[in-house]
Amino acid sequence: MLQMAKAFYADWRRYGKDAKKHEVWIRKHARNRGWSVNSRWMIYTNLKLWIADSEAMYGRRYCPCYEPSDDAELNRKLICPCQFAQEEIDTTGWCHCTLFGRGDLTAADYKRAEDQLMAEYRGTPLKLTDGVLDTRGQHMDVLRGLPVPDAIHQVKRAIGAVGLPLGVIVATRTEALHLERLAGLRSMHGEVVEGEDAWRVTLS
């Protein structure tokens, strides 16, 4: 909990003003679609901050649950509100990140959605050995064909747990370049090396 609180306040310092900007289109889009917006203040505020972080990382407001890929068409579908949201709301009652839900959802419903989301992103054990995190081999989201949790989420969690330096193994060049970009945004040094069957990124 302490680490989560520290991360929240760090993100608020970086993106608090941007989060207020996102409030406008989120509410407008929900009204237009007949959806509700997550009524739980902490997760809702975090989601706005994470969207702002995604925008700073990638130049677009991609869904905060997923790292964009090297597939441009898929990436367009990931721009929040993503093109998968309606299908998920029709099926489970809320979109994957829990930002939007059916119009009749209660705070208790959103709490259940949040618990499921946190189980995916914080309940999955990190493959971390001797300061090296292997991000490969995660569950693949059926609709998007993307790993959950992705490399960026795993790395942020690992840094919170063990700090720097951190070695990271990723499957693709795109993931490696994203980590290099994260390093630049967070005042870290990132070194990328291509291996035979994976990419290695050293963060310090």
Label each region the model flagged:
Residues 184-204:
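C-terminal edge-of-domain segments
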Residues 2-124:
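Long, distal/terminal scaffolding or interaction modules
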Residues 122-163:
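An N-terminal amphipathic alpha-helical segment
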Residues 149-161, 173-189:
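Amphipathic alpha-helical interaction surfaces in cytosolic regulatory modules
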Residues 165-172:
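Glycine-rich repeat segments that build the extracellular carbohydrate-interaction surface of secreted
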Residues 140, 167, 200:
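Short aromatic/hydrophobic contact patches that present stacked aromatics
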Residues 103, 172-173:
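Residues in the short beta-alpha loop(s) of Rossmann-like NAD(P)-binding domains
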